[in-house]
C-alpha cells in the first residue's frame, strides 16, 4: 500500500454483458482528506467508476483498495462510503430531521469504557438513595415519628453499603466479561487467519492452473499467423469483410479472380470460425480467473470482516436517542438547515433538498463521501452558493470527497485534483491549474475551457514557428525536440489586443459576441486560422489588430 493513499484503484475494468467496455484498466491513488473530481463528458465512465466504488456495480476485474484492503467483494453497507445522489432520493413522508436521522437507526458505536459504565450504574443506584433521603427530610419537616426516621436512616446506611458492594461486583463482572470476550476474539482471530491463509493458497493454485490453460489457448493463436494479422477482428468487421468479398465476386467476370476471391471468402469463414472457438475458450478462462480473483479478495478480508462482525455483536451498542439527536443537530448546523427540521421534502427548494441529502450522508460519519453530480439539477446561482458550502463542509469535516461532474468550471473551483476521463480511460490527473494551463492532449484542452490550438515547429531556445509563419516564444522548457512539430495552446483570455503591427502578429476581426463582462472576439490569421480571444472593449468587425501574450501562457502538446 502507498503509505499516503486512502484509496488505490489498480487495473480496474468494467465490461458489461453486451461487450461494452465502460472502464478500461484504470489505476488511480486518492489521498485521505482530498477533494477529487472525476470529470468527463456523458458516457465517459465516470458514473460507472463511482458505482464501482460504492458497490452498486461489480468490476469485471481489478482491485479497489481502501486502507490497503481490496473491498470489491464487500457488501455496500460495509463499505466506508456514503453517496449523495443527483435526484436527492429523500423519503417524501419524513421530515427533514427524520430523513437525516434515518441512517442512525442502524449505526453502532463501541461499548462505553468500564469507568463510564460504572459511573452510569452508580447514578442509577443513587436515584434510590435520593428518594429515601427526600422521604427522611419530609418526615423531619413534619416532626414525624422519630423512631420511624431512625429506621429509615438505618435503611439508607444499609442500602449505601449494599450498593457500594454492588458497584464493586458490577465492575468486576464487567471486567471478567470483557476479558473473556477479548480472549475469545484472540483465539477466533487465529482460527480465521489460518482458514483464510489456507483458502488463499487453494485459490492461488487454482489461478495458476488457469494460467497454464491460458498458455495452451495462446499457443493455439500462435500456430496460425492469420490470428495475429486479424487479432482485433470482431463480428461486425467479419460481416463487413464477408459482404465486401461477396460483392467483389458478384461484380467480377474473370473466372480466375472469382476462384481467388471465393477461396479467400472460404478461408475467411473457416479462420473466423476457428478464431471464434478459441476466443470462446479464452473468454471462459477470463471469467473463471476473475471469479477466482474475487475469492482472493474475499479471503484477504475474511479475518477483518469476521472480526468486525464479532465486535459489533459483543463490543458495540446502538446509539442512544440523545446521541442521535446531537449528531443530527450538529450536521443540520453544518449544512445550514437550522429552522427547517420539521418541513417535508415537498416544502423545500431544490437547493434545500440537496442540503438534506448531503446532511443524511454526513451524519453517518463515512470515511469517504461520493457525490454523483449533486448540483447539476440546480440553477446557476444556487449551484455556485452550494459549491462554496461544499468547500467549507469539506474543510470542516476532513473527509475524502469524490465528486462526479461534467461541469468543467465546477471541477476547477472545487477540486484539489481533477481526474479527466474519456471513453473509459483516465487521460490526465492533476491540480486545477495543471489541468487548465498544461493539458496533455488537444482533446483535454478543448474539453476544459476554450482553446486556440496552433500547429508549429520547435526551433530551440524556447522559440516556436507557427504553421502560418509567425515566430513566438514560450517560457516552459520541457526538453522539447528541436525541429519537431507540436500543437500549441493559447487560451482566449491570455491575448491582449493592441494596434496593428504592435503585437507578435496581426489578426483580423470576423465576428464578435457580448457575454456580459467580456466580448468574445473571433479573429483570423493571414492563413485563415481562427483565433478566439476575449476583450473588455468592443471592437469593429473587419478591423485588424496586433495581439500580445505572455510566453508563460504558451503551452506545447504532442501531435
From Swiss-Prot:
It catalyses: ATP + H2O + polyamine-[polyamine-binding protein]Side 1 = ADP + phosphate + polyamineSide 2 + [polyamine-binding protein]Side 1. Residues 108-317 are annotated as: Insert. It is found in: Cell membrane. It is an enzyme of class 7 (translocase). Keywords: ATP-binding, Cell membrane, Membrane, Nucleotide-binding, Translocase, Transport. One of its GO terms (cellular component) is plasma membrane. InterPro entries: AAA+_ATPase, ABC_SmlMolc_Importer, ABC_transporter-like_ATP-bd, ABC_transporter-like_CS, Mo/tungstate-bd_C_term_dom, P-loop_NTPase. SMART domains: AAA. It is a peripheral membrane protein. The keyword Zinc does not apply. It comes from the Bacteria. One of its GO terms (molecular function) is ATP hydrolysis activity. Pfam families: ABC_tran. Transmembrane segments: none annotated. Its EC number is 7.6.2.11. The keyword Cell membrane applies. Its main location: membrane. ATP binds at residues 40-47. Part of the ABC transporter complex PotABCD involved in spermidine/putrescine import. Responsible for energy coupling to the transport system. The complex is composed of two ATP-binding proteins (PotA), two transmembrane proteins (PotB and PotC) and a solute-binding protein (PotD). Belongs to the ABC transporter superfamily. Spermidine/putrescine importer (TC 3.A.1.11.1) family. This is Spermidine/putrescine import ATP-binding protein PotA. It comes from Mycoplasma genitalium (strain ATCC 33530 / DSM 19775 / NCTC 10195 / G37). The lineage of its organism: Bacteria, Bacillati, Mycoplasmatota, Mycoplasmoidales, Mycoplasmoidaceae.
Amino acid at each position: 500500500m502507498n503509505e499516503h493513499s486512502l484509496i488505490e484503484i489498480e487495473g480496474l475494468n468494467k465490461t458489461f454483458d453486451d461487450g461494452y467496455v465502460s472502464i478500461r484498466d484504470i489505476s488511480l491513488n486518492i489521498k485521505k482528506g482530498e477533494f477529487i473530481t472525476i470529470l468527463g463528458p456523458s458516457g465517459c465512465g465516470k458514473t460507472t467508476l463511482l458505482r464501482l466504488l460504492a458497490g452498486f456495480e461489480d468490476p469485471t476485474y481489478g482491485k479497489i483498495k481502501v486502507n490497503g484492503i481490496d473491498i470489491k467483494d464487500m457488501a455496500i453497507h460495509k463499505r466506508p462510503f456514503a453517496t449523495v445522489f443527483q435526484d436527492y432520493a429523500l423519503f417524501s413522508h419524513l421530515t427533514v430531521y427524520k430523513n437525516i436521522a434515518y441512517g442512525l437507526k442502524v449505526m453502532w458505536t463501541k461499548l462505553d469504557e468500564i469507568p463510564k459504565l460504572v459511573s452510569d450504574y452508580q447514578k442509577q443506584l443513587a436515584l434510590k438513595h435520593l428518594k429515601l433521603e427526600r422521604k427522611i427530610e419530609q418526615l423531619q419537616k413534619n416532626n414525624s415519628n422519630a423512631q420511624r426516621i431512625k429506621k429509615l436512616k438505618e435503611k439508607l446506611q444499609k442500602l449505601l453499603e449494599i450498593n457500594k458492594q454492588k458497584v464493586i461486583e458490577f465492575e468486576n463482572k464487567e471486567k471478567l466479561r470483557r476479558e473473556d470476550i477479548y480472549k475469545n476474539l484472540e483465539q477466533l482471530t487465529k482460527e480465521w487467519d489460518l482458514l483464510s491463509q489456507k483458502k488463499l493458497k487453494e485459490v492461488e493454485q487454482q489461478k495458476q492452473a488457469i494460467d497454464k490453460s491460458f498458455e495452451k489457448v495462446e499457443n493455439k493463436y500462435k500456430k496460425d499467423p492469420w490470428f495475429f494479422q486479424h487479432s482485433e477482428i470482431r463480428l461486425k468487421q467479419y460481416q463487413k469483410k464477408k459482404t465486401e468479398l461477396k460483392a467483389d465476386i458478384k461484380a467480377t467476370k474473370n473466372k480466375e479472380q472469382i476462384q481467388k476471391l471465393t477461396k479467400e471468402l472460404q478461408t475467411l469463414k473457416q479462420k473466423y470460425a476457428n478464431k471464434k472457438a478459441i476466443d470462446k475458450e479464452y473468454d471462459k478462462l477470463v471469467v473463471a480467473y476473475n471469479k477466482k480473483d474475487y475469492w482472493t479478495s474475499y479471503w484477504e478480508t475474511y479475518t477483518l470482516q469476521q472480526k468486525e462482525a464479532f465486535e459489533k455483536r459483543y463490543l458495540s451498542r446502538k446509539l442512544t436517542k440523545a446521541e442521535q439527536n446531537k449528531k443530527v443537530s450538529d450536521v443540520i448546523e453544518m449544512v445550514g438547515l437550522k429552522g427547517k427540521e420539521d418541513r417535508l421534502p415537498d416544502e423545500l427548494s431544490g437547493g434545500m433538498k440537496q442540503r438534506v441529502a448531503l446532511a443524511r450522508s454526513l451524519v453517518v460519519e463515512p470515511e469517504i463521501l461520493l457525490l454523483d453530480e449533486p448540483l447539476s439539477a440546480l440553477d446557476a446561482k444556487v449551484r455556485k452558493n452550494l459549491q462554496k458550502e461544499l468547500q467549507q463542509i469539506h474543510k470542516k469535516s476532513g473527509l475524502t470527497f469524490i465528486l462526479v461532474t461534467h461541469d468543467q468550471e465546477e471541477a476547477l473551483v472545487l477540486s484539489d485534483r481533477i481526474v479527466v476521463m474519456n471513453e473509459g480511460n483516465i487521460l490526465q490527473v492533476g491540480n486545477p491549474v495543471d489541468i487548465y494551463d498544461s493539458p496533455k492532449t488537444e482533446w483535454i484542452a478543448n474539453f476544459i475551457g476554450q482553446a486556440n490550438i496552433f500547429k508549429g515547429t520547435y526551433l530551440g531556445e524556447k522559440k516556436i514557428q507557427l504553421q502560418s509563419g509567425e515566430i513566438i516564444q514560450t517560457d516552459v522548457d520541457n526538453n522539447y525536440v528541436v525541429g519537431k512539430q507540436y500543437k500549441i495552446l493559447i487560451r482566449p483570455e491570455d491575448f491582449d489586443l493592441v494596434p496593428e503591427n504592435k503585437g507578435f502578429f496581426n489578426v483580423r476581426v470576423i465576428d464578435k459576441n457580448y457575454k456580459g463582462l467580456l466580448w468574445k472576439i473571433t479573429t483570423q490569421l493571414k492563413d485563415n486560422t481562427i483565433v478566439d480571444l476575449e476583450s473588455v472593449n468592443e471592437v469593429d468587425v473587419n478591423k485588424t489588430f496586433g495581439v500580445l501574450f505572455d510566453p508563460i501562457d504558451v503551452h506545447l502538446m504532442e501531435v
